[in-house]
Amino acid sequence: MQAAWLLGALVVPQLLSFGHGARGPGREWEGGWGGALEEERERESQMLKNLQEALGLPTGVGNEDNLAENPEDKEVWETTETQGEEEEEEITTAPSSSPNPFPSPSPTPEDTVTYILGRLASLDAGLHQLHVRLHVLDTRVVELTQGLRQLRDAASDTRDSVQALKEVQDRAEQEHGRLEGCLKGLRLGHKCFLLSRDFETQAAAQARCKARGGSLAQPADRQQMDALSRYLRAALAPYNWPVWLGVHDRRSEGLYLFENGQRVSFFAWHRAFSLESGAQPSAATHPLSPDQPNGGVLENCVAQASDDGSWWDHDCERRLYFVCEFPF
């Protein structure tokens, strides 16, 4: 069937071209219409033979004279031609087997411009809304900043007020401690001594005395030392307790200072009993008690014995009773 198709496609154009050449003005006047037609048929027959040989078809297929003489070949030719026409119709109608009943119109330049302008208008409206929201946010930020500044000012005022109240409270506590020390303790000249029965390290005891408006006891002379010894003996009898004084050599070993930085001018160190001299010890809980101070760099703070008023050096981190001194 494909061979017959190819044969028809090749023969028809050639026939048309040969027919046109045969009917040219020169040929018509040279031999007349009869000779031209006969010559044309011979050429067509020769061409068909060449095509049949080239395609491997039996001789006589596609020849009208042979078709008239052989009915079977004519029927085959018609069947082949009919099938070829049907295939051509199928091929022609295949691309348009499902046509779109509502084809979409192609956009025009005016439509494109209108669309772009619409989008620009939408963007401009959105940008305007953003500007409005930004303005609202800026206003809110300004309000919050002002509120925060007011809160900071109020907090600063409150902090100043609290600081002032704390200072007043500290002064009140110091005045209360001073009055309590002079009312409950020992008043001696322009000083008052008050014993505390709480166990504290030397530094903590100094801090507590300072918070109440005083400091650890700093006996300035022998008279104050003897008066303080009698006060402690009466308060803690019949026991012997070491009591922190405001004396230390933390700055330099052997250089004893009061808490106010003044250098100590006299000492009342404990001395052991001497059998050779027959002297009595200053504080004799045991005849073999060592002379003080004997702690070196390990014992830099001074405590007073409550029974005889002698001084002993101790580790500053020991927790002992302490006696405070207040100005009067």
Curated annotation (Swiss-Prot):
Summary of the knockout phenotype: Viable with no gross defects. Trabecular bone volume and bone mineral density is significantly reduced at two months of age, and progressively worsens with age. Bone strength is reduced and fracture healing is impaired. Hematopoiesis appears to be normal.
Post-translational modification: O-glycosylated. Probably sulfated on the O-glycans.
Residues covered by region (Disordered): 22-111
Keywords noted in UniProt: Cytoplasm, Disulfide bond, Glycoprotein, Growth factor, Lectin, Osteogenesis, Secreted, Signal
Domain annotation C-type lectin: ranges: 188-325
GO cellular component, one term: cytoplasm
Alphabetized PANTHER family for the sequence: C-TYPE LECTIN DOMAIN FAMILY 11 MEMBER A (PTHR22799:SF1), TETRANECTIN-RELATED (PTHR22799)
Protein's UniProt name: C-type lectin domain family 11 member A
Biological classification of the source: Eukaryota, Metazoa, Chordata, Craniata, Vertebrata
